[in-house]
Amino acid sequence: MAQEKPGCSNPVPNGDCPIIEKMEKRTCALCPEGHEWSQIYFSPSANIVAHENCLLYSSGLVECEAPDLPNTVRNFDVKSVKKEIGRGRRLKCSFCKNKGATMGYDLQSCTKNYHLSCAMEDHAILQVDEDHGTYKLFCQKHAPEGQEPTQRDAAVKAPFLKKCQEAGLLNVLLEYILEKMDLIHGRLLNETASESDYEGIETLLFGCGLFGDTLRKFQEVINSKACEWEERQRLMKQQLEALADLQQNLCSFQENGDLDCSSSTSGSLLPPEDHQVRCQESPEVQAGSGDSL
């Protein structure tokens, strides 16, 4: 269990607050973005590398408070991590039977020890309290009342699906699921969805890792749409600037008298030379043309 405690934020060494070497945070370049195991911490001097989750759930490791650090960076000192590694060498994992098991159940009556990955394989329940900075581990039997398991009981649910497939009913089950999704989809589009519909979709998307790839693709769509609208705004800004410049030029022409706004458009549309020839025609020609009509 990693739990925050008040720490020294003063970098200047004195009798009460010596300089402590901290683990440095890095992100795995090969893990999917946002993956829960992608955050790692390491110490170049001590040649130690550890997953962030393994540090957080280690029972004997305490994270120090550091007001000067961003919320996304954990504050583990190298000395405490080395001490926890030494403690783990004496503890055997109840699942894989190998040493290095620094995670234990929060209740003293549960004496099992695990590696974090082994605890998840054994269907342990992880409890996180971000407000108090606590990370606890419970077995299925002693989980707090109302606690929603973060790791589902795959040992029960996987055989159920296999039995459905053996009975030829897996397609029927999936069709019912799709019908439910289509129903909720229609309600969302028609704005008639209930609060339970919204909660069901949110739980489906964020309550498990099944749709992790879908959410990552959706994030790409959001970024693409944002770039598209930014480009539209840029083009609209250019057009507005061009229109404003054109309007200013027209006003300048009017002020300088380059535009004769008083001229009427109801006058003769004939070219000047044709208009002059028509005016010089004799009255006889004009009268003859009138008689021919």
UniProtKB/Swiss-Prot annotation:
GO terms for molecular function: zinc ion binding. Gene3D superfamilies: Zinc/RING finger domain, C3HC4 (zinc finger). Keywords: Metal-binding, Nucleus, Zinc, Zinc-finger. It is found in: Nucleus. PROSITE patterns: EPHD. It comes from the Eukaryota. GO terms for cellular component: nucleus. A zinc finger (PHD-type) spans 91-143. A zinc finger (C2HC pre-PHD-type) spans 25-61. Residues 262-293 are annotated as: Disordered. One of its GO terms (biological process) is regulation of immune response. InterPro entries: EPHD (IPR034732), PHD-type_Zinc_Finger (IPR051188), Znf_RING/FYVE/PHD (IPR013083). PANTHER family: PHD FINGER PROTEIN, PHD FINGER PROTEIN 11. This is PHD finger protein 11A. It comes from Mus musculus (Mouse). The gene is Phf11a.
